[in-house]
Amino acid sequence: MSLTRLLIRDFRNIETADLALSPGFNFLVGANGSGKTSVLEAIYTLGHGRAFRSLQIGRVIRHEQEAFILHGRLQGEERETAIGLTKDKQGDSKVRIDGTDGHKVAELAHLMPMQLITPEGFTLLNGGPKYRRAFLDWGCFHNEPGFFTAWSNLKRLLKQRNAALRQVTRYEQLRPWDKELIPLAEQISTWRAEYSAGIAADMADTCKQFLPEFTLTFSFQRGWEKETEYAEVLERNFERDRQLTYTAHGPHKADLRIRADGAPVEDTLSRGQLKLLMCALRLAQGEFLTRESGRRCLYLIDDFASELDDERRGLLASRLKATQSQVFVSAISAEHVIDMSDENSKMFTVEKGKITD
């Protein structure tokens, strides 16, 4: 599935844009503040319902406008799909697919699996566990049809349980929540464990190509003790949870530990090496999806040249081309991406929110 056309209206500093896109590489070149990252963010928002630079909707809608409008056309092997997303200042969204309203953002996410690589993406490696849980959950979402519903229900039950912890005095009063919570927690943890085990070889192979000087290891931590039933953990920790007023153990505390030569990667790797590792993990995840389902990812890469020397940029470019996926790359100068260009790619110039090809 590739995005063949993108319409943007009142998004960030872009008043209006109508872009015919390449199914291969699409380059967005412009000075800082020109709007090239806004194009990437518009694509991301079309597939996620939210921007990646700001959670405040008022900052995403163009100044003095009431809403942004995004439309796209997705070309699959057998059919074309029209998609649209409108969001106003109150945060109300409208999702349209093939001319019909009432759809969910999760449907857009399923139609447009994408990988985002930005200068801020180091949080996957040096940020809290929630970023690595999101990495695993992306894979589970695209691999397990029931994952999103289970994950949504888990979040709801945890919120209710945490609220109840402020009011109850005996564990028996929590059993109605835990009766629902326990099977969901165990199922989600099983899916995450299976996914991390399935993708482990892909991650190791790709990381070895990008960072041959290190031995990288990956271990999934489910969020509570090994060999212990979740029901036992919840009951045993009731008094502590009640004092904390939140549930201290469970799938919401899971992590994917990543080590280089036995040490945490954030303590061992340079910024350039961390970016290479981040790129390797995103590539491995996209390639794993393609092998498992036949679906290709869409890759968004902001500020391609930062932190990478010519050799590493060339390696990343060759691996991206090998995926045969659609790729969007922003850069300050065309010189940084000209070597990646071929007869099928498109080069867009971005200046003060205006986009030309």
UniProtKB/Swiss-Prot annotation:
InterPro entries attached to this UniProt entry: DNA-binding_RecF, DNA-binding_RecF_CS, P-loop_NTPase, RecF/RecN/SMC_N, RecF_2
A Pfam family: SMC_N
One Gene Ontology MF term: ATP binding
Residues that, per the record, bind ATP: G30, A31, N32, G33, S34, G35, K36, T37
Keyword ATP-binding attached: yes
GO CC annotations, alphabetized: cytoplasm
Subcellular location(s) of the protein: Cytoplasm
Cited PROSITE patterns: RECF_1, RECF_2
Protein's UniProt keywords contain Hydrolase: no
Any one Gene Ontology BP term: DNA replication
SUPFAM superfamilies, sorted: P-loop containing nucleoside triphosphate hydrolases
Entry keywords, A to Z: ATP-binding, Cytoplasm, DNA damage, DNA repair, DNA replication, DNA-binding, Nucleotide-binding, SOS response
Primary localization class, coarse: cytoplasm
NCBIfam families, A to Z: recf
PANTHER family in alphabetical order: DNA REPLICATION AND REPAIR PROTEIN RECF
Protein task: The RecF protein is involved in DNA metabolism; it is required for DNA replication and normal SOS inducibility. RecF binds preferentially to single-stranded, linear DNA. It also seems to bind ATP.
Family listed: Belongs to the RecF family.
Protein name as catalogued: DNA replication and repair protein RecF
Name of encoding gene: recF
